[in-house]
Amino acid sequence: MHDLHGERMSARETRAVGGLALVYAFRMLGMFMVLPVLATYGQDLAGATPFLIGVAIGAYGLTQAVLQIPFGTLSDHIGRMPVIIVGLLVFAAGAALAAQADSIWGVIAGRVLQGAGAISAAVMALLSDLTREQHRTKAMAVIGMSIGLSFALAMVVGPLATRAFGLSGLFWLTCGMALLGLLIVLLMVPRASTTLSHRESKVAPQSIGVTLRNPQLLRLNIGIGVLHAILMASFIALPLALVEQGGLPKEQHWWVYL
């Protein structure tokens, strides 16, 4: 990786960016794979209703939103690595809980626990710790690309994996991906010698109120919230429409997403 002025990232920076991008990708792939299949396969769970299936699809977002800033702040005090490691273990535990569930409530509990592994802020902070200022934009762009690619891949892999292994098997696969991400953190990602304060990742408690009242950010936050709500709602309606209106068996939905 190199910038427009020809100065290349160091080997350590490249390893950090690649490792953290993989951690992000495996975590997000595991999170997204369930989206195109839960509305159809989830109907076989005890107590399942369209509303509760929708709750299961979006439940992770609630705990993730609530815990994202606290986890980021915690990483300033105890270090990035411990927060990321614990977050991945919590995410894996949530996937394991959902994999063993035989009711929709068990899946909801697992998804809530998955969202509690909110490591995004800590990962971005560690990325800032491990890269120089002139390379930080490129590093964050790589992370962004890994998220986009994992979403696209999940739309195909999710239906295929569920067809092969069932919904429980899909959650076990998600658990395995989280543990693989943990191995990458432990074996590939360099250790930061110091925990620095960065404008990209720092939380200033005294500014939270001002930030929440900022009109431009309010419009942005509401717009993004509506966008995500529509996206999650589409994964409740679209798979069912493909089966009931389109006559397409749920085992073949991956063709549509491909």
Regions found by a protein language model. Give the residues of each.
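Short amphipathic helix-loop junctions that connect adjacent transmembrane helices
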Residues: 36-50, 236-252
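C-terminal membrane-cytosol helix-exit motif in multi-pass small-molecule transporters
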Residues: 176-195
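Hydrophobic core of transmembrane alpha-helices in multi-pass small-molecule transporters
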Residues: 25, 94, 105-118
